[in-house]
UniProtKB/Swiss-Prot annotation:
Stated name of the protein: Non-reducing polyketide synthase nscA
PROSITE patterns associated with the record: CARRIER, KS3_1, KS3_2, PKS_MFAS_DH
Annotated cofactor note: Binds 1 phosphopantetheine covalently.
Involved pathway(s): Secondary metabolite biosynthesis
Length: 1798
């Protein structure tokens, strides 16, 4: 290098004037070019360090940083916004300058030219940190490494400065930025200092918050301090007020403040940095101090950073000294020196000043001064980019879940299946398709399968729709693969302990999903039979992944891949690639396959893929194809370093994953050994692994001749070559899971991976069961010599000491793709051994339904019974910090496992458990912090928190350092309890309490508690004001400390006392005034704590006299342990001085409301908060009770508000509970209790109240000591959502190629043989009978003479209308038939027909020769002794069944003995009422009606045929009646119980409603929508005599509805009962509209054909309540009420009339306002209609639509919102926007809107 050359590199404290985003973008682009290798390394290291530093931030700060993959991701964040502004600005400036520096050298491709002695470094403020990295470097590669550490220090410095500064003055609550520094020009440093000194003196400014000089030169002075004080200083000083000054862009706090920072502050920033550079690296280049202008004297990196830290925090900047130092360096040492250079990053005022000074120095000399801009290179074009390769991390699989054949619904069951060597082969179950019609071994029948075999998962339709916010309708239409993908994804995440957002790697924006799927059976077959709203989102593949991302709110990528049979493992490989590429930080991957479509069976069979003989016979000589299988599997994958940092359980490590294609195969479906071997080599090379070291391979192994031969060749050649040969101890074991569970196609690869992971877990290779006869001769003969072979028995696979086992998983696609995964053992985890001193632990469980919560509790109890040695700490960690939490919650704090077991058993044994559990509210309750006064003080308060939690400890220490800098004693010994247990001074007592409370408030914020308001009691009000941002923490400490000093100086300790009295203030006054000896005693009211608790103060003698007097009246009194009588005249001597001190303190508007005990109001602005307020608060009464009442009156406090007592002991919590008995009040600390236990209990209480604490922060200090337990998985509240494939249409479509056959009208054949035929049930169309379940489908024609005659026996408006007795007979007929099928030897079958609900009346058509079919579907479950029934209309031409039922009911098979006992107790009461009616009739007080008169009255609504007229006489008294009944002797057909007999004994209720004077029968008629039950103790007898009795009454929940019980007596005995039969009032003007014959017999909408139905009834009783699938009403052919009328009038009862829920007909009469008035509108009827419509469309029960139910939870998404808004318009005449479901997110808000606007 030229000896005449000198250089200065200057690092500025300002960003270049260029567009910052563009600068960083250009840096990022260049870093991707291999020519900028060191720049890339520096940016990568800086990114890693920033991620590490962000991960260590307290949660509230951590959440401010968006997820970022590189520093470029942070550029869009406004540096200056929020509490991390200083940290972000400092670190980004350091990154930018060092990146530009490194890039400059790499762009020039020049050697390092900074030579000690010839080059010097200089900088200002943060720029010095960047310069330090260069000073520590001997080459450019050193800068990249040291620079990243400089970034760490700059970030930490910014965080620390902002934190300390916020304690001096809180940021503006409205986010307005205020400058902490102003520059003054044309004034000397001395004159400015004089003005500042005068201001600080005059305003009594505390030392810490004084205004000071932070920088100076000959032309300007920088003034720094809290923004409000700078403003006050410039207003106070006339000189400064009129000076030339400007605010500097310094928005985040104070540096260069020697009065503020100490060496301990510097050490906490520098010495705590995890640096591998700082300890031993030497300083290579001189770096000038910005204070002295001389080089720092440090010799090592650690010394240099400490010096720089000291200068940045405490040193004043003197620009003149910097300039002088630079000039000195450039000063010529000899005449030969001629070339000087200044390198910089653009220019600035400071740099121009330096440049001018140097030029002035060399003026007249022959010296050359040049400037080099280190920014210019970044904008150059370097030609085409030369990409760099991405480094690969190892990946960790941390969670897995499955649904696999053979009942393997979890991993334990899957392993048991493998370990036992079980084969899950079975025939196709009838719930998939009917083998009787779709299986033809000859293959002659078109579209049939030639094999009946497969491997199937259990209960594929079972799903917890409510958990995943899906409506039953959406769930039913959604592909079971997609549903189970959701389920297994959740279970895998649960196993992995993933809580989205808990760590940087699990931020929702960094999680992606990758699933393999190769078929669409459900969409193409099952759901396509009746295409609905959810056909696309429920069936299209992309929605499978999309639904996972949407439910969990993951915004990473979602990919659905199809690579045929390798789809599952290819999805895993894609996930690995995304992790290696940095696209995601966590990936969920898996494979999906659920078989339902016989077409795929046929296609695969015809292509000779499938075995006709059974299971996959892997490597067997008779291998003849594969056997199909279901399968669902999910795994969770992270980068290994992230998994270790997150304290995850690592199942195995992925070293490599590759996919290629068999392009050279002889056909597209034929495997190719060369391609497979090439893929193995690629994955081995990717990981740098010797193939000989692999000891287990999970084969693709399908059991095909070609596949087995090729794979055995490729595997043996690569992993067990002839040479080098494997040693005897290097046995290579092979396995193939398809021999157990078949070929899961898209799920095959994930099943193989799951098996391999279990092999790692269990250290055992399960036996191979694929060879049924002998090994396939196509397999290489020398495998044994190569030391490779199948594990034919369960073979131990131990982990070698100090080594890791390697395994390979293969999965090949039929299209030619080959995917291979290379695994190794997880790192051996060394659990940190700590001293577990937490006394209690919080154990939590949650669910989204009561049943699931109860089941989760049962599972945990069972687990603990099985593993009683479980670590309670690990259990608490797992159930709280590592679980996603839901709205049904259980939580407890316990000290031992046995205590937890006791609590669980107690809860589970509670018979009222289900009713007592309530979901937490959707809206998070507000939380108010209540700060106690000094009366709660004791030594050691918060000691355990201080010792355990670094964040809490740091807060206390920072506040304590501030107190010490203000001249007060340290409070740390009080908290540590290292002080002598003697009375403390008021200063120490009061400062300790306030510092503790401020630190506790911040700790609660760290734990995730969002504060809504604060209240302080006495001294606690200072902490409250500080937390609310009214005053800074420093000012709070200063005022409290000085206040305490004034009290010590001016007030006599022990002369006064305070007395707590259990009585209100006025009562105390009256009691004292009533006695002469106490009437004149002087005292003052210090505190009104509650309406019954008062604290008074005064002189000791007088207070003692009062105490004795009040105790004599049995009033509880307590002398408080305080040295002064606060809030009394004793405080008068300090008030003036306290107010003067407070006037120097800036007061700001509160960031959260302040509840004021002084003013008894809630304060929202700064007007009332000032020095006078603190004066009055010191002297006047603390009216805590009035303040609470005011907060209630102003709506800030309600019954759900949560209170947290912030202080040493929960005094305020007790006061709040006294004022609000229902209040939830928690503690922060408690005297004589471990403070961690107190916090733990309070966190549980908050959790149960609906707050979501940040449990991760609670466990963070010791997370390495805890283990994530593998607990039982979530217990789902499942219901079977299954659409069976109905009919044979996959077969029938084959005939289309021969031409469409002519269609013929549908008819119900009465000549076709049927095992069940009656007058109403005509033909069985489908029947399945199993061990405990049975299913029956029947079809009937309402136009059949027997059926039609039964209908015409009950006419309304001259139309035959099916009466409820018809549905009763059909139900009893089918019920007895099916019951006897399961229990054939039953003598008598006693049935209780319950829950009868008819949504649409059935009116007989008057078209002669027409067909009017209806379908009855029944499902019987013997385990619950119940049967569900649903009636459907069917198309009169095609026979197609409607998708939705018009009626439903249940039958319960019961013991008649219980009925007899029940009715025997009631019989005398019923007989008594009958006798009363007879007596009243004889007295003329009740009406006795003859048969003709009774039925004449009935004819007002219903005209009964003669056979239905069984009532001989009736006694009617308003709504009560009895009848004498004689049944006609003729049955008139084939029935179980003739409808005309049923009607005769029960229709007395209808006569009461439609014939009594108590009803307005002129304007209204009454129809019945159903009943709760119908029972007959014995069969009705022909010609027998009965009596009926009923008393109807209005139902309180609906003014248009009446109900009552009809009793049927034979002799003196009750022999039957219709329980709670209901009648609805309907305007008579609607008679024509509701009861007119249908004009068509067709059913709208495509529906599945009826013929050939085969359905398996699933027993769901053990997992969920028996509940028929809810089906909405369909549009019937008969006319219905218009939409206008539907919205104005009560809807008619649907049993006998069409419900207003039906669609509006095309032509509807206009309803005039007068008609609307006559309809007697009822406000809540519109609400009822709306709710029923929503229930119908979503498939939910109306009962589920509670006021607090949210539409999101009910599964109402944007698509359903559109559907509902359209239905509201067309059916109810209500115009709403679909967005209303977002604007009114709950049912209650929606109904309120409807009431208001509709």
């Amino acid at each position: 290098m030229d000896s005449t050359f000198r250089r200065v590199v200057f690092f500025s404290n300002e960003f270049p004037s260029d567009d910052l985003k563009e600068l960083f973008r250009r840096l990022d682009q260049h870093s991707k070019d291999r020519r900028f290798r060191l720049l890339s390394i520096f940016l990568e290291e800086s990114t890693a360090i920033l991620k590490d530093e962000v991960s260590k931030l307290p949660r509230p700060l951590k959440e401010l940083v968006p997820p970022f993959g590189s520093v470029l991701g942070l550029v869009d964040v406004d540096f200056r916004q929020g509490p991390l502004g200083a940290a972000m600005e400092s670190s980004m400036l350091t990154i930018l300058e060092l990146g530009l520096f490194i890039g400059h050298y790499e762009s020039e491709d020049t050697e390092w030219d900074l030579v000690p002695g010839e080059s010097v470094l200089a900088g200002l403020s943060i720029g010095i940190l960047a310069a330090a990295a260069v000073a520590l470097s001997s080459g450019l590669s050193d800068v990249a490494k040291a620079g990243a550490e400089a970034v760490r220090v700059s970030f930490r410095l910014g965080v620390y400065v902002a934190d300390i500064s916020a304690k001096l003055e809180a940021p503006q609550s409205d986010g307005t930025l205020s400058s902490w520094a102003h520059v003054v020009t044309e004034m000397t440093e001395a004159s400015v200092q004089d003005e500042l000194k005068q201001f600080n003196t005059d305003t009594h400014s505390p030392e810490l918050t004084k205004v000071f000089i932070s920088a100076a030169d000959k032309t300007s002075v920088s003034v720094s301090g809290p923004p409000s004080r700078i403003k006050a200083a410039f207003q106070h000083s006339p000189v400064l007020r009129y000076s030339k000054s400007l605010p500097l862009p310094v928005y985040d706090g104070l540096c260069h403040a020697s009065h503020l920072y100490t060496q301990s502050d510097i050490d906490s920033i520098i010495n705590s940095a995890e640096s591998v550079i700082l300890p031993d690296r030497s300083v290579r280049l001189a770096l000038l101090s910005s204070k002295t202008g001389k080089p720092f004297i440090a010799k090592t990196a650690s010394e240099l950073f400490l010096e720089i830290g000291t200068e940045l925090l405490t040193g004043t900047i003197y620009l003149d000294n910097v300039t002088a130092g630079i000039v000195r360096h450039l000063q010529p040492q000899s005449k030969e020196m001629s070339s000087w250079q200044i390198d910089s990053f653009r220019t600035s005022l400071v740099l121009r000043s330096i440049h001018s000074a140097v030029e002035a120095k060399i003026s007249g000399e022959q010296r050359q001064l040049t400037r080099r801009d280190l920014v210019n290179w970044v904008n150059k074009d370097f030609g085409p980019r030369r990409p760099r390769s991405h480094a690969s991390s190892k990946l960790a699989i941390v969670g897995m879940a499955c649904r696999l054949p053979g009942g393997a619904n979890d991993l334990d069951l899957f392993w048991k299946l493998l370990e036992e060597g079980r084969d899950t082969l079975t025939t196709v179950p009838p719930d998939r398709f009917d083998l009787n019609t779709h299986y033809d071994p000859t293959g002659k029948t078109e579209n049939t399968t030639q094999t009946p075999y497969g491997n199937f998962i259990d209960r594929p339709g079972f799903f917890d729709a409510g958990f995943f916010n899906m409506s039953p309708r959406e769930a039913e239409q959604t592909d079971p693969m997609q549903r189970l993908a959701l389920v297994t994804a959740y279970e895998a995440l649960e196993m992995a302990g993933v809580v989205p957002g808990r760590t940087p790697s699990t931020h929702p924006s960094r999680i992606g999903t990758f699933y393999g799927q190769a078929s669409d059976d459900w969409r193409e077959l099952n759901a396509s039979q009746n295409i609905s709203t959810y056909a696309v989102p429920g069936g299209e593949r992309a929605f499978g992944n999309g639904r996972i991302n949407y439910f969990f709110k993951f915004s990473g990528p979602s990919f659905n891949l199809d690579t045929a049979c390798s789809s599952g493992l290819a999805a895993v490989q894609a996930a690995c690639s995304a992790l290696w590429a940095g696209e995601v930080d966590t990936a969920i991957a898996g494979g999906l396959n659920v078989i339902t479509d016989p077409d795929n069976y046929c296609g695969l069979g015809n292509a000779h893929f499938l075995s006709k003989t059974g299971q996959c016979k892997v490597w067997d000589k008779d291998a003849d194809g594969y056997c199909r299988a279901d399968g669902i599997g999910s795994v969770v994958i992270k980068r290994l370093e992230d998994a270790e940092a997150d304290n995850d359980n690592i199942l195995a490590v992925v070293l490599g994953a590759c996919t290629n294609h068999s392009a050279e195969a002889i056909s597209i479906t034929h495997p190719h050994a060369g391609a497979q071997k090439a893929n193995y080599r690629q994955v081995l090379n990717q990981a740098g692994v010797n193939p000989i070291d692999v000891s287990y391979i999970e084969l693709h192994g399908t059991g095909t001749q070609a596949g087995d031969a090729v794979e055995s060749e490729s595997v043996s050649d690569i992993f067990a070559p002839v040479t080098p040969r494997r040693r005897p101890d290097q046995r290579l074991y092979l396995g193939a899971v398809k021999s157990n569970i078949g070929h899961g196609e898209a799920a095959a690869g994930i099943a193989s991976l799951l098996k391999a992971l279990l092999v790692y877990q269990k250290n055992l290779i399960p036996m191979h069961i694929g060879i049924k006869s002998e090994i396939n001769p196509t397999i290489p003969k020398d495998l044994e010599r190569r030391n490779v072979g199948l594990a034919m028995q369960n073979t131990p696979w131990p982990r070698p000491a100090g080594k890791k086992r390697l395994a390979v998983v293969n999965s090949f696609g039929a299209h030619g793709g080959n995917t291979t995964l290379l695994l190794e053992d997880a790192p051996e985890r060394v659990k940190i051994q700590g001293t577990e001193d937490r006394i209690t632990h919080s154990v939590l469980l949650s669910a989204k339904s009561k049943k699931s919560l109860q089941a989760n509790m049962e599972s945990l109890l069972s687990y603990l019974d099985q593993y009683p040695e479980t670590s309670l700490a690990d259990l608490a960690y797992t159930t709280s910090s590592r679980r996603m939490h839901h709205n049904m919650r259980f939580g407890t704090s316990v000290s031992c496992i046995s205590g937890l077991q006791k609590v669980l058993r107690s809860q589970l044994d509670n018979p009222n458990f289900a009713s007592e559990v309530r979901p937490v509210p959707n809206e998070v309750p507000s939380v108010i912090l209540a700060f106690t006064g000094q009366g709660a003080y004791y030594h050691g308060m918060g000691r355990e928190l201080f010792a355990e939690f670094p964040y809490f400890r740091a807060q206390v220490q920072q506040l304590d350092r501030l107190a010490q800098r203000l001249g007060f004693p340290s409070v740390v010994p009080v908290i540590e309890n290292s002080i002598e247990d003697t009375p403390s001074s008021p200063i120490l007592t009061q400062l300790s309490v306030v510092i503790l409370e401020i630190a506790l408030a911040r700790f609660w914020s760290l734990l995730g508690v969002s504060i809504s308001a604060v209240i302080g009691h006495s001294l606690g009000e200072y902490a409250a004001l500080a937390v609310a941002g009214v005053i800074s923490a420093t000012d709070a400490i200063y005022l409290v400390g000085r206040r305490a000093q004034l009290i010590e100086e001016r007030c006599a300790q022990g002369s006064h006392s305070m007395l707590s009295v259990r009585a209100p203030e006025d009562a105390i006054q009256k009691m004292l005034a009533a006695e002469p000896e106490t009437a004149s005693i002087a005292y003052e009211v210090s505190c009104c704590n509650t309406n019954q608790d008062t604290v008074i103060g005064g002189l000791n003698g007088e207070i003692n006299d009062i105490r004795r007097a009040l105790e004599a009246k049995s009033i509880k009194c307590t002398i408080l342990d305080v040295p002064y009588a606060f809030h009394t005249a004793q405080m008068n001597p300090i008030l003036d001085d306290l107010e003067a001190l407070a006037k120097a303190v800036p007061f700001k508007a509160p960031s959260i409301p302040v509840i004021s005990p002084l003013l008894a109001t809630v304060i929202y602005d700064v007007k009332s908060l000032n020095a006078d307020y603190l004066r009055r608060a010191t002297r006047e009464t603390v009216d805590f009770a009035a303040a609470i009442e005011a907060a209630q009156d102003m709506g800030l406090v309600d019954s759900k508000t949560i209170w947290i007592d912030v202080g040493p002991h929960p005094i305020c919590a007790g006061l709040v509970r006294s004022m609000i008995p229902s209040a939830s009040a928690m503690s922060s600390c408690r005297r004589n209790e471990d403070s961690i236990s107190t916090i733990s209990k309070s966190l549980v209480a908050l959790y149960l109240a609906g707050i979501n604490p940040c449990w991760a922060e609670f466990f963070k200090p010791r997370e390495g000591e805890y283990s994530l337990l593998h607990l039982p998985k979530y217990r789902w509240n499942e219901i079977d959502y299954w659409i069976p494939y109905i009919g044979t249409w996959t077969l029938d479509k084959a005939h289309l190629k021969h031409g469409t056959k002519p269609t013929t009208p549908f008819s119900v054949s009465m000549s076709r043989p049927s095992a069940l035929r009656t007058s109403l049930v005509h033909q069985i169309t489908a029947e399945t009978v199993e061990a405990t379940t049975a299913m029956l489908h029947t079809i009937s024609d309402m136009q059949h003479p027997d059926f039609l005659e039964a209908i015409h026996g009950h006419t309304m408006n001259k139309c035959g209308v099916a009466t409820s007795s018809i549905w009763s007979d059909m139900a009893f007929t089918v019920g007895e038939y099916l019951y006897r099928r399961l229990v054939p030897n039953t003598k008598d079958v006693h049935m209780n027909l319950t829950d009868v609900e008819v949504l649409h009346a059935q009116v007989a058509s008057k078209t002669k020769g027409s067909v009017q079919p209806l379908v009855l579907r029944a499902h019987l479950n013997l385990s619950t002794n119940s049967m569900s029934l649903s009636w459907f209309n069917a198309d009169g031409e095609t026979g197609e069944c409607a998708a939705e039922s018009f009626a439903s009911a249940m039958i319960r098979f019961e013991d008649p003995v219980a009925w007899r006992k029940e009715w025997a107790r009631l019989a005398h009461l019923v007989r008594g009422r009958i006798e009363v009616l007879e007596q009243r009739a004889s007295e003329g007080k009740a009406s006795r009606l003859s048969k003709p008169l009774a039925y004449a009255l009935f004819k007002n609504v219903v005209d009964y045929a003669d056979r239905y007229r069984g009532m001989d006489s009736v006694v009617l008294d308003e709504l009560e009646a009895m009848a004498e009944v004689t049944l006609v002797p003729e049955r008139y057909g084939t029935w179980h119980t003739p409808p005309h007999w049923i009607d005769s004994v029960s229709h007395l209720a209808g006569l009461v409603m439609n014939g009594s004077d108590a009803s307005n029968t002129r304007d209204y008629f009454f129809v019945t929508p159903g009943c709760d039950s119908f029972r007959l103790l014995k069969k009705l007898e022909p010609g027998a005599r009965y009596r009926s009795y009923v008393r109807m009454f209005p139902l309180p929940e609906d003014p248009n509805m009446h109900g009552g019980d009809v009793y049927i007596l034979q002799g003196e005995e009750i022999v039957g009962m219709v329980g709670m039969i209901r009648f609805r009032r309907v305007p008579r003007l609607l008679m024509d509209r509701f009861f007119s014959p249908p004009t068509t017999t067709s059913v709208p909408g495509p529906v599945p054909p009826l013929a050939g139905v085969t359905m398996k009834y699933h027993d769901i009783a053990q997992t969920a309540p028996v509940r028929p699938t809810p089906t909405p009403p369909i549009v019937l052919p008969n006319p219905v009420v218009s939409s206008t009328m539907a919205s104005k009038a009560p809807e008619p009862a649907p049993l006998l009339a069409t419900s207003s829920e039906s669609s509006t007909p095309k032509e509807s009469p206009i309803v005039t306002p007068a008609e609307s008035e006559r309809a007697d509108p009822v406000d809540n009827n519109m609400i009822s209609q709306c709710l029923r419509l929503m229930a119908r469309e979503t498939g939910l029960e109306v009962e589920a639509l509670t006021a607090d139910a949210s539409f999101v939870q009910l599964g109402v998404d944007s698509l359903m919102s559109l559907v509902l808004s359209e239905k509201f318009r067309t059916e109810l005449g209500v115009e709403i926007k679909s967005s209303l479901f977002l604007e009114c997110p709950t049912i209650g808000e929606m109904t309120a809107w409807i009431e208001e606007y509709c």
